[in-house]
Amino acid sequence: MAENKRVISIENRIPELKKYRKKKLVRHLAILIGIFVILIAITLYFLSPLSKLDKIAVSGNKQLTENEVRKESGLEIGEFVIGISNGKTEDALKKNTLIKDATVSKEGLNDVQINITEFKTIGYQQQDGKYYDVLESGIMLTDQPRQFPIGNDLLFQNFKNGKTLEKMVDQINKLPKDVVSSISEVIYSPTKSDKNHIKLYMNDGNQVSADISTFAEKMQHYPAIVAQLAKGQKGVIDIEVGSYFQSYYQQNAEKKATEEAAKEKKETNE
């Protein structure tokens, strides 16, 4: 009897086993079909124009042309969109001395938008009859000379790309706008005792003698210093150590007295 019951039990389970195997087979087939469909979709995507970069839009550029920005980005029309890294493209753009900041974003399925912020031109270096942009970053564009300066920005003289120019621009950037707009020219004129000496010609007719390292700290008081001068009085304001004013009249008188003394001494020796 026990053996008969066992045979009957196995026979009853056979349909269930077949049903389980069928479900398992269907599940495996579904997985395989799904993988196959995904592979086909991926293949079709990479074969379609949608997978490739179609358009590179540029905004925020003023000095750089759109084509120059595209070239700096390293992106090329027709390359696979999936391989484009926004971060790496932004880093590539920021290597350009004119670009202060850059953001890259994907638009739609296969377009890229590039937005840049350029360093502003704060003045021009006057050299050999040409003018070279001096940027707010402290860099001078030596490969892009102009015939004439644009607007009423500062004029620089005797500067070269390097730490001295960077320090000078950094000091200027710290000044209030009204003080900067009162400056006409900044001339680098180092002496034996002061390698950071500069001379400024002001729009109001005065001159300023200063040191680059303390320029912003002391030059911010220029309006107050000028306000204390007699009306119409012009001269040289020395802010290297403290603050000292010498009128052009005094300066010329001292120069004349020195020349006369030298002349008398020469005549006496003869």
UniProtKB/Swiss-Prot annotation:
Membrane side Extracellular: residue ranges: 50-270
Pfam families: FtsQ_DivIB_C, POTRA_1
PANTHER family (alphabetical): CELL DIVISION PROTEIN DIVIB, CELL DIVISION PROTEIN FTSQ
Boundaries of every POTRA domain copy: 51-119
Subcellular location: Cell membrane
Membrane association type: Single-pass type II membrane protein
Gene responsible for this protein: divIB
Transmembrane segments: 29-49
GO biological process: FtsZ-dependent cytokinesis
GO cellular component: cell division site; plasma membrane
Species, as recorded: Listeria monocytogenes serovar 1/2a (strain ATCC BAA-679 / EGD-e)
Keywords for this protein: Cell cycle, Cell division, Cell membrane, Membrane, Transmembrane, Transmembrane helix
Domain of life: Bacteria
Main location: membrane
Protein name as annotated: Cell division protein DivIB
Family: Belongs to the FtsQ/DivIB family. DivIB subfamily.
Role according to the record: Cell division protein that may be involved in stabilizing or promoting the assembly of the division complex.
Residues in compartment: Cytoplasmic: 1-28
InterPro entries xref list: Cell_div_FtsQ/DivIB_C (IPR005548), DivIB (IPR026580), FtsQ_DivIB (IPR050487), POTRA (IPR034746), POTRA_FtsQ_type (IPR013685)
